[in-house]
Design a protein with these regions (language model features):
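Core segments of cupin and vicinal oxygen chelate
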Residues: 2, 9-49
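Structural preference for long, well-ordered alpha-helical segments within the folded cores
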Residues: 19-20, 83, 118
Length: 140
């Protein structure tokens, strides 16, 4: 069976994206790419490569119309929620399955959608069984 282990995201400001995914979401910084035009982050299993992109800004898509989005399971949903608020993140939807409008002042009980610095939709959940067929290692 194949295993997804890598995702690459183009960004307008590589260091800002690094701070978002490392300090706010909780990924670990691995290293810069040899060209210094990219960097790698990891959760220990999956790798996210952040690539500096100098093209004209792309439009931010409304949730549900984006080309791609991805989901992250976190150990402490409330802590991530608080860091996202401190960051000034834009929240998109309450509950990744029901996609209800969100009240950005009320922590959803299970999951939510947020935009990264480049407008990518990121599903955030504290529920380990959020996505069918996903088996996670035991928490340390």
């Amino acid at each position: 069976m194949p295993f997804l282990r890598h995702l690459a995201l183009r960004c307008r400001d590589m260091e800002r994206s690094r701070r978002f995914y490392e300090e706010v979401i909780g990924f670990k910084f691995v290293d810069y790419r040899p060209s210094r035009q990219g960097l790698d982050l990891s959760d220990g299993v999956n790798n996210i490569t952040i690539l500096q992109h100098s093209a004209v800004e792309r439009p931010v898509f409304e949730e549900g119309n984006e080309y791609i989005h991805f989901g992250i399971i976190v150990e402490d949903l409330e802590a991530v929620w608080q860091r996202l608020h401190a960051w000034g993140a834009m929240f998109s939807r309450d509950d990744v399955k029901q996609r209800k409008p969100i009240d950005p002042h009320v922590l959803p009980p299970r999951s939510f959608k947020v935009l990264d610095p480049d407008g990518n939709v990121v599903d955030i959940t504290g529920y380990r069984e959020e996505w069918r067929g996903v088996e996670l290692p035991a928490l340390a």
